[in-house]
Amino acid sequence: MSVDSIYERLQSCLAAQRVAESGAAVEPTARWPFDRTISYIARTHFDEWNLTVEDIHETAIENLVKRSEEMAANVAQDEEGRISLVVLSQRDGYDASRLLLPTLHERLSEHLASPFIAAIPHRDILLCFRNDAETVQRLSPQVAEDYRRMPHQVTEQLMIVTPDGVAPYVG
């Protein structure tokens, strides 16, 4: 199979790290959908296609952005009427991966303030919420429970989302 034939289907995803080489909670990878199945790209393909990890990542992110242009989100408000939680759950297998969207901070910080917290306990949900002690304490146990209980686990580690990117939350 040539790289041209899969380029438009290449999607970025976050998967649980199976081999803890870097100590990171999650690692970005790429995959492409074939009707009802998904195939992960092996590093050997990079050499065959004469592509770098950066080439694959850039294309996968571009495709994820296109796939995510029009999405519905569920929100919860606090007692003052401020949005305190945004839930992205399209159930397309890429919800956790949307943490990688380049405009995520820009789009959600107007509602959640900056920086905000994100959680990706499993593949089919991205939770973004205010970075305040009460909200973090309230939602952390549910994130941990979802991680233990749901299939396609990613991580129970909370992430902090800033204008500069995403990092593990140490709170």
Predicted regions and their residues:
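Short amphipathic alpha-helix segments
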Residues: 95-109
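Short acidic (Asp/Glu) and glycine-rich catalytic loops that position anionic groups and cofactors
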Residues: 82-84, 119-123
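Hydrophobic, Leu/Ile/Phe/Ala-enriched alpha-helical segments that form helix-helix packing faces
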Residues: 60, 64, 68, 104-108, ...
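Short amphipathic beta-strand starts and helix->beta connectors
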Residues: 71, 107-115
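C-terminal structured domains
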Residues: 112, 122-171
